[in-house]
Amino acid sequence: MAEALLHDGTTISILVSGDGRALLIPADLKPRSESEAQTMRDWGADPDLGPTLVSALSQSYRVVAADYEGHRMAHPAPDTLTPENVAADFLAIADAAHADTFGYYGYSWLALCGLQLAIRTNRLWALIMGGFPPLEGPYKSMLAVTRAAHSAAARSSEQSPAVNLPVEPGDWDAATIQTNEAQTRQFVTLYEALQDFGDSTVALARDLPRLAFAGSADQIVYGPRWGNVTVRIGEPLAAHERELIEAGWDVQVLPALDHLSAMHSDVVVPLLKAWLGKVGRDQVGREQ
């Protein structure tokens, strides 16, 4: 495995798999115990997502995989997780993998990172944002949620989930704080830095292929513990679909899927393969 030196002096492991054009994916590849996997399934998540993505996409691309979220939970950057530093971190990962140009796929806040990366570099040959709209992004509501999480973590470092309680898939309001003060503060830092970010004024290179997708039911409702906010993702993507297409985006709103189900490998793998294949054919056609 290669390693990249990040902005805070920590190093992150990188897996490179396959041949072809480089495709950077911030994916969690660590194996799950059966109990961990079952808990994730109970919540509606896909415990095999990372390995499945890498295995499927490395058949056609040189996949550069690094667990950036896991790294930041193990090595928080509470004061320095800014958009500029996040972009620099992903460029460092690409450099360590000797990827002069690369595609990028990220989901949820890692999709946000991809947008911040795209406005700071000309090295991308494709950008895919899943589970976070490029226009009317939920920056204010996510700041409220992360501030609430940080306040709860700061009050107690010993909060843990109740054991063997049934969970309702997608019941985000029932989630318990399992992160510490530094881990949560880094996301406050990130979203505070994005409060003045005007996604309606973002001008990406016209020739950069880009895809945004989300489930039509991707809306997360938080109660008083989390700031009484609703994080809307599918709704703004659908509302701005025509505007985004006119700006050069491809848009897919996935019927009836929520935030977790829209990121499952059985949804994402065929979607990415089809779209990336189209991008490749279009680029070959322009070169002929």
What annotation goes with each model-predicted range?
Residues 44-73:
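Conserved alpha/beta-hydrolase
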Residues 20-35:
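Short beta-strand element of the alpha/beta-hydrolase
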Residues 134, 184-202, 234-238:
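Active-site nucleophile elbow and catalytic-triad environment of alpha/beta-hydrolase enzymes
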Residues 84-102:
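Conserved acidic catalytic loop of the alpha/beta-hydrolase fold
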Residues 216-253, 259:
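Conserved loop-alpha-helix segment in the C-terminal half of the alpha/beta-hydrolase fold
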Residues 112-123, 127-155:
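Flexible "cap/lid" loop of the alpha/beta hydrolase fold
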Residues 245-288:
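Catalytic active-site module of serine/aspartate enzymes centered on a nucleophile-bearing elbow/loop
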Residues 212-214:
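Short beta-strand/loop motif that positions the catalytic acidic residue
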